Each structure stands twice: as structure tokens, then as C-alpha cells.
């Protein structure tokens, strides 16, 4: 139910001239009395001669009233109503009532009944009179047809009255014969007795049929009871294959438990394998990064040593001729040791293994003192670090090459 439908319904009923005021609050709760009154008024407005009982006291009367209204509107006005919603007599019944009121309201609008209230009352009275005259016309036509048929039959009977009068007079004047009367009475009694006998035979047949049916019913009951007992017996007996079935079921349960355990173990091992691979990959990445870091530091140290070596060469040219190569080595050896010690500060807890060889074979003891060992917990880190440190022998070669011009300069002096 919508507010617009309820408002339109109240306005249409007011325009049609419904004597009672309909409020919008009347259909908040079921109000079958108001709905029945409105339906009866609308039906009378559509057909004044309609005879529909207005009794709605009991449930059966209300159902009959709703069905009669719906049947009348379907046959006369071709309006299909929902009896269930009408019987609810609440807001949903307003939509069904709108179907009737909208037809009457549109008819009133087409006939120019949109004037004032006084004009509406006059037109309504005229409409009521016109409806009653139409009903009187129908009744007059029916009475005229009945009068015609009855007059024709009366004329025929009056034409036969002369002959019938003579026959009636003769029958009255003729004396009654007792023998013939008794004969007719006996014949009638005999016919009645035969009919009574036939009726008794039918009753006996009915009794026999009843006995036969009772016997069949009893037989069916016995069969049913016997089948029920047989069913109970079959249900109580344990089948022969149940032992094998239970044994197979236990085996299947064990197999399933084993499968479930193995599946869980397999899943766990796969997870452990994935974790191991991930850890190995992380260690490999860490070793790779460490190697790159060591290489970068070694390159920086090499550049620094080359730069410091060039400065030392310029100082050696200015020194005196009696300065020996051993003194030069003693000056240069502390520098790479200091660089390697700086490199080891970035990697605490590890030992670097490597050699820093000089240009001359006589300085083996000094070169052995400059070796720094590096040891790691993992073999891969040791190999990578050994490979990185193997690059270090190139440094003293360059220093040796730089020291050759010094010998030539000594010879010049």
C-alpha cells in the first residue's frame, strides 16, 4: 500500500458521493466492516438491482460475500479482483478497490460529472433512476415473454374444454364397478410388491458386498501383518557379509590413516626443503655481496698503494746513493699491512689468508710476516674469499716494476 493509492481512493470515493467519510487511517489495521460496506456500495452503484447478501458476521459469510463480489465484477464489469487481498481488509485491499472506483470515476468524468457537490448529487440521483428504469425494462421484457407463452397454452386448453367437459360428464355419470376397481388395485399392489422385493434384493446384495469387502480388508490386514513380521525378522538377522564388510572398512581406515600421515610428512619435508633452499640462496647472495665488497676494497687499496708508490719514487730520486734496497723495503712493507688491517675491520671474526710478495727473493721473511689469513665457517665463503685474495699478488709486481728505475738511478750515481 502506498500513500498515493490511499489518497486517490479517498478522493474518488468522495467524488462518487460515498456518504461516509473515509480517512487514511482506516486501513492501517484490518477493517473488514468498512471494506464490505464499500464493496456493497460500489456494486449497488454499478448495478442497483444486484442481490448480494450483506451478512459478514461469520467467517463463512465473509468468504461467500467476497466470492460473490468478485464473481459479479468479473461477469458484469470484466474486472478481476484478488479475493485474498480483499479478505485481508487492510492497505492491500485498497489496490483492489481502486480497480472498481477508477472505472466508475472515469465514467463519471466522461459524462461531465466534475461539477460542484450539488450537481454531483443530482447526477447521481439521475443515474440511480436510470439504472432502476433499465432494471424495470428487463423485468418487463421477461414478463411479456412469460405472458405470451402462458396465453398461448391457456388458449389451447380452452379449445379442448368442450371435449373434456363431455368426457368428464360421462365419467362422473358412469357408476363404478367394484370388480374392476379391485382388479386395478390388485395390479397396483402387485407392482408395488415387486418393487419392494427388488429393493430388498438390492439391500441383500449390498450386505453381501459389504461382507465381501470386509473379508478382503481382513485378508489384506493379515497379509500386511505377515509382511511386517517378515521385515522385522530380516532386519534382526545379521547379514553374512557384514564381517567381511567391517574388516574391509577397518583396513581402509588404516590405509587412510597411513596415507594421511605420509602426506603430512611429505608436506613437512617439502616445506623444510624450501626453507633450506631459501637459506642457501640467502647465504649465496651474502657471499656474493661479501666478495664484491672485498674486491672493491682491494681495488681501492691497490689504487692507494700505487699512488703512494709514485710519491715514494720521487723521494728516492732525491736521496743519497748509499741507501740500500732493504731500507726501501722496510719503508714500503708497513703500508699494505696497514691497508689489510683496515680491510679486516669491516669483517670481524674472520681470518684472511694471503701473501704480499716483494720484488726480490731475499725478502721472503718480510713477506711471510705480512701474510694475513682469513677463515670462515662455510666452505663456499672460504673459496670465494681465497679467490678474491688471490688478486693481491699483482700489487707487489707493480711495486717491483716501479722500483726498477731506482736501481738504474743508483747505477747512474
Curated annotation (Swiss-Prot):
What are the protein's UniProt keywords? Answer: Cell projection, Cilium, Cilium biogenesis/degradation, Coiled coil, Nucleus, Phosphoprotein
Q: Where is the composition biased (Acidic residues)?
A: 312-328, 360-388
Q: What Pfam families does the record tag this protein with?
A: Cluap1
| Compartments it resides in | Cell projection, Cilium; Nucleus
Residues forming coiled coils: 198-291
Regarding tissue, the record states: Expressed in testis, thyroid and trachea and to a lower extent in spinal cord and adrenal gland. Highly expressed in colon cancer and osteosarcoma cell lines.
Residues with the modification Phosphoserine, per the entry, are 314, 324, 326, 409
Which InterPro entries does this chain map to?
Clusterin-associated_protein-1
What's an example GO cellular component term for this entry? nucleoplasm
Q: Which GO terms describe its biological process?
A: axoneme assembly; cilium assembly; floor plate formation; heart looping; intraciliary anterograde transport; neural tube closure; smoothened signaling pathway
Chain intervals for the UniProt region annotation (Disordered): 305-413
Q: How does it assemble?
A: Interacts with CLU/clusterin. Interacts with UBXN10; the interaction is direct.
State the family it belongs to. Answer: Belongs to the CLUAP1 family.
Q: What else is known?
A: Associated with a number of cancers such as colon and bone cancer. Possibly involved in polycystic kidney diseases.
**What does the protein in this record do?**
Required for cilia biogenesis. Appears to function within the multiple intraflagellar transport complex B (IFT-B). Key regulator of hedgehog signaling.
Instruction: Report what the protein is called.
Output: Clusterin-associated protein 1
Species the sequence originates in = Homo sapiens
The gene for this chain is CLUAP1
